[in-house]
């Protein structure tokens, strides 16, 4: 197990109980001007260790690149795979869906600890030197155990900075700069600086190549729920992605990552298009059927004319899949505009 020097005590920003798929767990910030990052790497040059890192107010020092990594949530697992460190994954948990096809070979033999949050005992049995989580609540008493406990046992923990829930650590809004900063920082932690730089450069180029729609279309980001829909609000990954595509979010005024929005409010907003989140537990097709049988939404032009865009659930949380989601949704939107 890699040595760990604790740089600071837990600052009290551990999350509350674990939430289910699609829940508004991370208090992420959304698009627009850059917000201060809640994570900070040491001033050491790239590739230098020891390396001090901080996420959500919890500081630690990695004495060397971790060799035994446990990830919780798809965003964390896919980040490690994308940076070429999949052979150091000794366990994963809480997958939100299949990994991208290009990462599937590297993920094929990685052990799966649990469908949701693993027990802390199961994690510790693997003797990890890093536990990397996508949600702050993944590392809590109701999740895979408190971060302080891991610290006391010499195990480093890291939470996606966009997922910090404490007001003093949470970015005001999610931006692509913050997403790419996480790629850079995780690359430094893993000793994969070059791979991280290449991924960041590729994603910046891909994002720059996207031409947002200028049609002024409004959109509803429909994640889950039938009695009351659960939708993308104004400061998280859905807002960031819609901005990049050129869609006006009908729930942009809600200062949260996700929110409940009554069907009557949806009907009043009368969105031009509906973005459907496709998850194994709540498919895009199921959401189409829900919209078509709901008397409040069945008469909406977007529903009657099937003006739908589809995005996979793992791409809806801050991570390396956000930029590809922009490219894909922009292409879908262009086809939809031609069809109209």
What are these regions (language model features)?
Residues 120-133, 263-279:
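Proline-aspartate-enriched helix->loop->beta-strand connector
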Residues 96-98, 231-259:
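Alpha-helical, coiled-coil/dimerization segments enriched in small aliphatic residues
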Residues 173-182, 273-340:
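Structured C-terminal subdomain patch of bacterial secreted/periplasmic proteins
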Residues 98, 137-145, 155-185, 216-239, ...:
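Extracytoplasmic ligand-binding site segments that recognize negatively charged/polar headgroups
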Residues 53-57, 111-121, 141, 254-263:
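Short helix-initiation/N-cap motifs at beta->coil->alpha
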Residues 1-77, 185-222, 332-340:
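Bacterial Sec-exported substrate-binding components of ABC uptake systems
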């Amino acid at each position: 197990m890699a040595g760990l020097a604790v740089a600071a005590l837990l600052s009290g920003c551990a999350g509350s109980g674990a939430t289910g798929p699609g829940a508004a767990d991370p208090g992420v910030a959304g698009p627009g001007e850059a917000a201060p990052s809640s994570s900070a790497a040491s001033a050491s040059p790239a590739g230098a260790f020891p390396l001090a890192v901080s996420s959500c107010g919890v500081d630690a020092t990695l004495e060397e690149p971790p060799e035994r990594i446990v990830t919780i949530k798809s965003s964390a697992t896919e980040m490690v795979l994308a940076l070429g460190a999949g052979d150091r994954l000794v366990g994963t948990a809480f997958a939100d869906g299949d990994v991208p096809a290009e990462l599937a070979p590297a993920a094929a033999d990685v052990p799966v600890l649990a469908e949701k949050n693993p027990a802390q005992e199961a994690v510790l049995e693997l003797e990890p030197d890093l536990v990397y989580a996508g949600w702050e609540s993944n590392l809590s008493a109701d999740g895979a155990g408190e971060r302080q406990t891991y610290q006391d046992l010499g195990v480093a923990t890291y939470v996606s900075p966009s997922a910090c829930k404490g007001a003093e650590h949470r970015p005001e809004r999610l931006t692509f700069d913050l997403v790419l900063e996480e790629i850079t920082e995780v690359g430094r932690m893993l000793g994969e600086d070059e791979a991280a730089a290449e991924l960041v450069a590729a994603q910046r180029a891909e994002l720059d190549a996207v031409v947002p729609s200028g049609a002024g279309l409004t959109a509803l980001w429909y994640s889950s729920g039938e009695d009351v829909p659960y939708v993308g609000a104004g400061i998280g990954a859905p807002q960031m992605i819609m901005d990049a595509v050129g869609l006006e979010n009908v729930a942009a005024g809600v200062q949260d990552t996700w929110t409940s929005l009554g069907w009557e409010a949806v009907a009043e907003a009368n969105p031009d298009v509906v973005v459907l989140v496709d998850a194994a537990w709540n498919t895009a097709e199921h959401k189409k059927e829900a919209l078509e049988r709901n008397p409040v939404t069945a008469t909406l032009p977007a529903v009657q004319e099937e003006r739908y865009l589809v995005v996979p659930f793992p791409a809806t949380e801050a991570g390396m899949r956000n930029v590809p989601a922009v490219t894909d949704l922009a292409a879908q939107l262009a086809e939809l505009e031609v069809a109209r």
